[in-house]
A protein has these predicted regions:
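S-adenosylmethionine
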Residues: 1-127
Length: 128
């Protein structure tokens, strides 16, 4: 409300591993904080995370990159020309996610560090 975005922002909750319904096309921005922990790393997580966070919110597949591949491939067409796909990434995953975006035709790929200096956000633009 403070920024008068209510009429201009739509939040949706969908299965990101499936292609979007045609009603969900024409986004300017898709922001995604997918599960990114490699399956084999989950048993070693701190108990406060491992035992209390839903497993589906943590498990990013064998290498932690399953959701990045799926969302990049299946949701690219839902972005407008000039639209941006923004991902939160796990520690050390930024180069792999940059590569996934590049291989899927995204341009202007940028990576941003968090307040601890860890590369945490990767984004790319669709310029078909």
């Amino acid at each position: 409300r403070r920024n008068s975005l209510n009429a201009r922002v739509t939040c949706v909750s969908v299965n990101a591993l499936e292609p979007p319904a045609s009603a969900l096309w024409d986004f300017d921005i898709i922001a995604c904080n997918p599960p990114y922990i490699p399956t084999g790393d989950i048993p070693g997580l701190d108990v406060s995370v491992r035992d209390y966070e839903p497993h589906m919110a943590l498990d990013g597949g064998a290498d932690g990159l399953d959701f990045y591949r799926a969302v990049t491939q299946k949701w690219k067409s839902a972005l407008r020309l000039g639209g941006t796909l923004i991902f939160e990434v796990g520690i050390g995953q930024a180069p792999s996610v940059e590569d996934i975006l590049a291989r899927n035709g995204f341009e202007g790929i940028q990576t941003t560090a968090d307040t601890q200096g860890i590369w945490r956000v990767v984004e790319g633009t669709v310029n078909r």
